[in-house]
Amino acid sequence: VFTYRDYMSRVRGGHNFTQIRFSDKEVYSYRAKVDLILALNRETYMLHRDRLKEDGVVISHEEISEERLIRLPLDQIKKKVKNPKVLNTVGLGAIAKYFGIPFSISVEVLKETFNERSYSDNIAAFMEGYNLLDSKHKLQIKEDRNIIINGNKALALGAIAAGCRFYCGYPMTPSTSILSYFSSRSNEMGIMVDQVEDEV
């Protein structure tokens, strides 16, 4: 699995996106062309439509003039799923179904990701998206002893292995997850973690 996150250098707003490439073989970079675009707004579609493969699809709730569009009826789903904050998870459900990811595996991932309070809303939203379309691909499930780890977590683990016992930082992208990981392991690893008042 190779992920690439792109975000603008501003406190809030701007166009942000994540590109995910996965394979049963090792991958070392992303590719220019993509199989699927989940467009949460029209701007995303306009900026990335030229990167879509000929047999690719766009999943969006926006009114887009695109033959390959799979439309998410979020206005209807909103009436069933009372929490508007989880509507993005509808798109996640549609992606999982499109790639043929088993529902049971998806449920386990959602349980690991969300706390008990938000899990029920997110699983309801996920099911709405999952039931919207048919699978185009059928991924083979393989056991893999390798772990999935991001760069910041690898950096934090490396620092701990090298003997780091103090970490001081401010929760600001792109280093927020380093601070979060150190904080979550501080008691277990005997590390002093300090979050400073501001980024200066």
Question: Which residues fall in each region the model found?
Answer:
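Active-site cofactor/cluster-binding pocket
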Residues: 1-168
